[in-house]
């Protein structure tokens, strides 16, 4: 998990929580909001894990939303290990950084977001294409949904 920053056409800043499975490259969520706290990360995880289940491990950086008490409690309750990357070492979480680069170049840089709802819809459309249509060389030129 990681965050990407962008803005609406009005200039109002948004933060997007990006989540990717390192094995299948499947992205269960890209979730834009005006602000994020630890409890917001937990709400997003609980929503998506109802569908895809809880992972064994979640790799995150040292951001305040990820070192929060809320996320720590959820991880403890669900038996999930939080694997923190070393401060200042984005290569420790290279899968999500690669995903974020594709997300920025193919979605964020190609759209104007007129509202948060507009951003949510355009990002969801991109995420579905990424998961269901786009072949990934790292997984044998298959779409992540096929794994």
Regions inferred by a protein language model and the residue ranges of each:
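Charged DNA-binding/catalytic regions of mobile-element recombinases
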Residues: 1-147
């Amino acid at each position: 998990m990681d965050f990407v920053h962008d803005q609406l056409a009005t200039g109002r800043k948004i933060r997007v929580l990006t989540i990717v499975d390192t094995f299948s490259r499947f992205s269960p969520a890209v979730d834009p909001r005006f602000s994020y706290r630890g409890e917001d990360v937990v709400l997003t995880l609980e929503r998506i894990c109802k569908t895809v289940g809880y992972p064994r491990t979640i790799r995150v950086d040292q951001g305040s939303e990820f070192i929060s008490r809320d996320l720590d409690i959820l991880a403890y309750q669900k038996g999930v290990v939080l694997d923190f990357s070393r401060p200042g070492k984005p290569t420790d979480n290279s899968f999500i950084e690669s995903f974020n680069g594709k997300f920025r170049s193919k979605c964020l840089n190609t759209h104007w977001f007129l509202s948060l709802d507009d951003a949510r819809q355009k990002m969801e459309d991109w995420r579905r294409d990424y998961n269901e249509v786009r072949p990934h060389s790292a997984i044998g030129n298959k779409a992540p949904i096929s794994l």
